[in-house]
Amino acid sequence: MTKGILGKKVGMTQIFTESGELIPVTVVEATPNVVLQVKTVETDGYEAIQVGYQDKREVLSNKPAKGHVAKANTAPKRFIKEFKNVELGEYEVGKEIKVDVFQAGDVVDVTGTTKGKGFQGAIKRHGQSRGPMSHGSRYHRRPGSMGPVAPNRVFKNKRLAGRMGGDRVTIQNLEVVKVDVERNVILIKGNIPGAKKSLITIKSAVKAK
């Protein structure tokens, strides 16, 4: 069954194991998420739980949103997300989901929004090779051939310059190194997408090895 939690990326650091091995880790702060709704097949057509993360001011919420969170006896939430394929019997409206849903050694999938890089060329955006930089060359960082002459057009999905970053990306099969319940912190091995303070979704790995 799937377990999941929403959190905030704090940054990267490194820790040492008992054997002296250095492990780079990403620190994710996940304050308690609140279950706002439990969806069932009878009422909604599918099974899922809806969780809210990070309080926001009531003046920024409309009446339907306030009424929705009032059932869970909590404040309006800035981020709301559903997790499917969960054990519904373990959840009820108003229950808090804390970082202890995961343990050290668990394998998880982490989703975040990558850093926006703005308008970039084909070399930086797609990793293409550049031309010779020596004297006499007129081809340095250009995109190269746009395609054959015959169709008289540029095919769709041709790798050209454009906006880079700001994409929703999931990295699979990352290991949970440590869980600090007192500080509401999860340490995940390696790097994860997104800038500092960005929203991160952590859930059980779909393709766990």
From Swiss-Prot:
GO BP terms, alphabetized: translation
Keyword list, A-Z: Ribonucleoprotein, Ribosomal protein, RNA-binding, rRNA-binding
GO MF annotation terms: rRNA binding; structural constituent of ribosome
A GO-annotated cellular component: cytosolic large ribosomal subunit
Coiled-coil regions listed in the entry: none
Pfam families attached to this UniProt entry: Ribosomal_L3
Region annotated Disordered, chain positions: 118-151
Family recorded in the similarity comment: Belongs to the universal ribosomal protein uL3 family.
SUBUNIT field: Part of the 50S ribosomal subunit. Forms a cluster with proteins L14 and L19.
HAMAP family xref list: Ribosomal_uL3_B
Main function: One of the primary rRNA binding proteins, it binds directly near the 3'-end of the 23S rRNA, where it nucleates assembly of the 50S subunit.
This protein's name: Large ribosomal subunit protein uL3
Species whose genome carries this gene: Enterococcus faecalis (strain ATCC 700802 / V583)
GN (gene name): rplC
